[in-house]
């Protein structure tokens, strides 16, 4: 997939607008607030709420854009801090924010214990990114098993026979591979390690999956932002980020072999192909992971972002304001999602979410 200039401009503008709308820095964007759940405010109605959220950096570019547009439409703001899924889960459990965001779904038991509700917000993809001079995006091919061996430290150089065999005609350097991973609790890490656990028995037994894992080797960066920064700085490095960060930073991403055996590149189309098999209707509390999904064109590390809210907050109006923002986003934010290479939720799933709000977030 080649990035069109319009798409990159939209991505850059989304982040800039999200930050300026709230006066925040790179890690914290104030985003427009919300208005109702039990009785959501009408779209376009002027409100004055200011709501706080924190969590996944995966969804930060999209929430920033939604927030700026919602602010322009309603005058409301939300302050969303890009601190990682682990931090978002911790803050919503503590009640220090109005919503948390995580790319790892919580189980029904975890939600019940913490008094939380959970619903999807958008779908995107985790992509391996590399710093190899002269390499174009999508030209380097990595199977899941090979990617696991690289992050296990078994494949140590770019001219290793396993990489060369998978990439005939690609000019590869002789140097050492430097691994870059997340240093914070991360839903991006969860989806990356969950996928590797599905395709590599050795990875599953030695490292496993989680928002934080014991990495065999490498350099840790905070947030998608931190990983992207390190990969850009370190020649011969490889890391993993949400696609928007790869595009924003002009970093070459790899092609990958999916469960159907086909080589695919990351895009909204290949993310949608992976999401097509998702059975949300059978997923209690939307607890569903869609890595390594079937589908001829499915991207293998496709991920869902989830929003978390307290069922019984101290101030019920805060929930109403927060849900009004998400209702607006679902009704008016599809174009923004497409521009930033996310996949907006299908209409049937949005109906399911709104029914869930009515019963679980009164």
Where are these regions (language model features)?
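Terminal targeting/leader modules
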Residues: 10-12, 16
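Bacterial N-terminal signal peptides that target proteins for export
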Residues: 1-10
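C-terminal motif of bacterial Sec signal peptides marking the signal peptidase cleavage site
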Residues: 17-21
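Flexible loop/hinge segments at secondary-structure junctions
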Residues: 23-362
């Amino acid at each position: 997939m080649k990035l069109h200039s319009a798409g990159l401009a939209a991505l850059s503008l989304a982040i800039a607008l999200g930050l300026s709308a709230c006066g925040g820095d790179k890690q914290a964007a104030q985003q427009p607030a919300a208005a109702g759940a039990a009785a959501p405010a009408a779209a376009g109605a002027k409100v004055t709420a200011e709501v706080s959220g924190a969590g996944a950096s995966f969804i930060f570019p999209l929430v920033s854009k939604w927030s700026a547009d919602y602010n322009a439409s309603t005058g409301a703001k939300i302050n969303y801090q890009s601190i990682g899924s682990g931090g978002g889960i911790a803050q919503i459990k503590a009640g220090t924010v109005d919503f948390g965001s995580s790319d790892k779904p919580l189980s029904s038991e975890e939600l019940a214990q913490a008094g939380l509700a959970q619903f999807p917000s958008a779908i995107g993809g985790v992509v391996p990114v590399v710093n190899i001079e002269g390499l174009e995006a999508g030209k380097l091919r990595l199977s899941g098993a090979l990617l696991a061996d690289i992050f296990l430290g078994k494949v140590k150089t770019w001219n290793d026979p396993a990489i060369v065999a998978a990439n005939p005609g690609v000019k590869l350097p002789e140097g050492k591979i430097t691994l870059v991973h997340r240093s914070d609790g991360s839903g991006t890490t969860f989806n990356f390690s969950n996928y590797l656990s599905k395709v590599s028995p050795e990875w599953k037994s030695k490292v496993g999956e989680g928002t934080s894992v014991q990495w065999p080797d490498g350099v840790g960066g905070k947030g998608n932002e931190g990983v992207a920064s390190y990969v850009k700085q370190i020649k011969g490095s490889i890391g993993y980020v949400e696609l928007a960060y790869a595009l924003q930073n002009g970093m070459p991403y790899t092609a990958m072999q999916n469960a159907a055996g086909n080589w695919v590149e990351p895009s909204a189309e290949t993310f949608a192909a992976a999401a097509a098999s998702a059975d949300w209707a059978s997923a209690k509390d939307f607890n569903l992971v869609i890595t390594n999904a079937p589908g001829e064109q499915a991207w293998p590390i496709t991920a869902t972002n989830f929003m978390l809210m307290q069922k019984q907050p101290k101030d019920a109006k805060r929930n109403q304001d927060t849900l009004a923002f998400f209702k607006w986003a679902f009704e008016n934010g599809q174009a923004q999602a497409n521009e930033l290479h996310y996949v907006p939720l299908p209409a049937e799933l949005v109906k399911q979410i709104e029914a869930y709000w009515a019963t679980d977030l009164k």
